Amino acid sequence: MAVQTPRQRLANAKFNKNNEKYRKYGKKKEGKTEKTAPVISKTWLGILLFLLVGGGVLQLISYIL
């Protein structure tokens, strides 16, 4: 192994100081968001959709006849 110059020693110390933060925990992950549950459940959404579409179909049938 070669002998380090003072400039290399300072550069290595600076590099180690910056990387010491991430060695224990890893780099911070940004941009990930937590998934939240929908405001209304799928069951209630299906019931509401059935009522709206079914009501519209009945209106069309009564309008045609």
Swiss-Prot record:
Its main location: membrane. InterPro entries: ER_stress-assoc (IPR010580). One of its GO terms (biological process) is protein secretion. Signal peptide: none annotated. Keywords: Endoplasmic reticulum, Membrane, Transmembrane, Transmembrane helix, Unfolded protein response. It is found in: Membrane; Endoplasmic reticulum membrane. The chain crosses the membrane at residues 45-65. It is a single-pass membrane protein. GO terms for cellular component: endoplasmic reticulum; endoplasmic reticulum membrane. Pfam families: RAMP4. Present with 846 molecules/cell in log phase SD medium. Belongs to the RAMP4 family. Interacts with target proteins during their translocation into the lumen of the endoplasmic reticulum. Protects unfolded target proteins against degradation during ER stress. May facilitate glycosylation of target proteins after termination of ER stress. This is Protein YSY6. It comes from Saccharomyces cerevisiae (strain ATCC 204508 / S288c) (Baker's yeast).
